[in-house]
Each structure stands twice: as structure tokens, then as C-alpha cells.
Swiss-Prot record:
Subunit relationships: Part of the 50S ribosomal subunit.
Keyword list, A-Z: Ribonucleoprotein, Ribosomal protein, RNA-binding, rRNA-binding
Name this protein carries in UniProt: Large ribosomal subunit protein uL6
PANTHER family: 60S/50S RIBOSOMAL PROTEIN L6/L9 (PTHR11655), LARGE RIBOSOMAL SUBUNIT PROTEIN UL6M (PTHR11655:SF14)
Any one GO molecular-function label of the UniProt entry: rRNA binding
Superkingdom per UniProt: Bacteria
Function: This protein binds to the 23S rRNA, and is important in its secondary structure. It is located near the subunit interface in the base of the L7/L12 stalk, and near the tRNA binding site of the peptidyltransferase center.
GO biological process, alphabetically ordered: cytoplasmic translation
HAMAP family per the UniProt record, alphabetical: Ribosomal_uL6_B
Ion transport as UniProt keyword: no
PROSITE patterns: RIBOSOMAL_L6_1
GO CC list: cytosolic large ribosomal subunit
């Protein structure tokens, strides 16, 4: 039995959840999200709660996945998601101008990113980046793409890392 799939989702008053064919739309104070919802999983909405059920035992994993996706959509349109990145290294800095993010991270050229639709990028300081949006998947994907430009290396810890990420350090070579 899918334990995640059996959990009930509490729907805030400001949020509406509607199903249109195979798509599900969630509207809230921060915006609107639409995504494909597998027809093998059904849901029932009553008294500000959503209950999920599946048609067969073979759809056990899908049951929990669809429930988690809908829960993250509801959280996104009410509170939104924020990912914070930190740049560690001499001369590493980031500058955000509107939808454009420019990184100087030790290459001979600056690396530029265009923020996807619905994503805002801020640089509170030259060495920190904040990515905000209503879609958990898009925010996480964009943060991962930025981190992949210069992931933290294990010897000095230089690179782009998530704010709460722990970088496992290695010892360098020992002399004779």
C-alpha cells in the first residue's frame, strides 16, 4: 500500500484545484500551474481535502508520485519555492539584471543564463543567488543548471553550491 498516496492533502481556502481531461490545474495567490495527471489515479475533493485512489495494485508507485506532485503544486501557488546558491572562490561573483544572470566563476569568459518563464533571480550579494518561483521542478532544475557550471571541488571547496550543501573535503597530497 502506498503510504504517501493515502495521505490527505489539505487545500487552503485561496487555492482551487480543477481537473480538465488528463490535465490538472491549481490556481492560487502566487499564480497558476497546470500539469498532466495520470488517469489511472483518481482523486476526490471534498471539505477542503483531496483523497486519492488507484485502480490497480500495479499503480502503487504512481499513486504516491501523483499525490506528491499535486501537494507540491499547491504549496507552490500558496508559498512558492526558493533555492539559494553560494559562490565560494576568489573572484567568483554573480550579477542579476532582470531575467539575466551573469556568473564570473574562474573561466576566461562570463557564463550567462536566461531565467525560465515564472522564475525570478536575485543576487543579495555578489556571492549569493536566490531563485524563486511557483514550480518546484523548474526552480530546482534551474538551480541545478547553475550549479553544474562549477560544482564544488573536494580539495579547496571552491565552486557553486546550494546554501545548505555540505561539501566533503579531501586531504591533498603529502610531501616526502
Amino acid at each position: 500500500m502506498s503510504r504517501i498516496g493515502l495521505k490527505v492533502i489539505e487545500v487552503p481556502e485561496k487555492v482551487t484545484v480543477t481537473k480538465n481531461g488528463d490535465d490538472i490545474t491549481v490556481k492560487g495567490p502566487k499564480g497558476e500551474l497546470t500539469r498532466y495527471f495520470d488517469p489511472r489515479i483518481t482523486f476526490e475533493q471534498k471539505d477542503g481535502e483531496i483523497h486519492f485512489s488507484r485502480s490497480s495494485e500495479a499503480d502503487k508507485a504512481l499513486h504516491g508520485t501523483e499525490r506528491a506532485n499535486l501537494a507540491s503544486m499547491i504549496e507552490g501557488v500558496t508559498d512558492g519555492y526558493v533555492k539559494k546558491l553560494t559562490l565560494v572562490g576568489v573572484g567568483y561573483r554573480a550579477v542579476a539584471q532582470g531575467k539575466k544572470l551573469t556568473l564570473n566563476v574562474g573561466y576566461s569568459h562570463p557564463v550567462e543564463f536566461e531565467a525560465p518563464e515564472g522564475i525570478t533571480v536575485k543576487t543579495p550579494s555578489a556571492t549569493s543567488i536566490e531563485i524563486e518561483g511557483i514550480s518546484k521542478q523548474v526552480v530546482g532544475q534551474f538551480a541545478a543548471e547553475i550549479r553544474d557550471v562549477r560544482p564544488p571541488e573536494p580539495y579547496k571547496g571552491k565552486g557553486i553550491r546550494y546554501e545548505d550543501e555540505y561539501v566533503r573535503r579531501k586531504e591533498g597530497k603529502t610531501g616526502k
